């Protein structure tokens, strides 16, 4: 886990956030939700902004991710929200 991931997770979810490398295939990280369940996010087959620091790729990813349909915007722990705020900031 690189320094940006932990820093972004603390900024988004607070200093007491529990984030670990994922135990699920093809997922990068898992975050413990208040209900005691884990939320898995990020695809370990692809780089994210915390790895490549390419602003153009960040802009393109965020344009795609923010247009995903569904109720993910109201769930702070949705995989899409976690990816946007932790892996792409």
Residue ranges and their predicted role:
Residues 1-89:
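Arg/Lys-rich, low-complexity, intrinsically disordered basic segments
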């Amino acid at each position: 886990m690189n320094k940006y991931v932990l820093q972004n997770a603390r900024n988004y979810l607070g200093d007491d956030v529990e984030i670990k490398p994922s135990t699920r295939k093809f997922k990068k990280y898992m975050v413990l939700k208040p209900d005691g369940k884990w939320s898995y996010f990020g695809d370990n087959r692809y780089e994210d902004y915390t790895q490549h620091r390419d602003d153009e790729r960040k802009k393109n990813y965020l344009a795609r991710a923010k247009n995903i349909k569904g109720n993910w915007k109201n769930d702070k722990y949705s995989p899409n929200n976690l990816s946007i705020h932790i892996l792409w900031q």
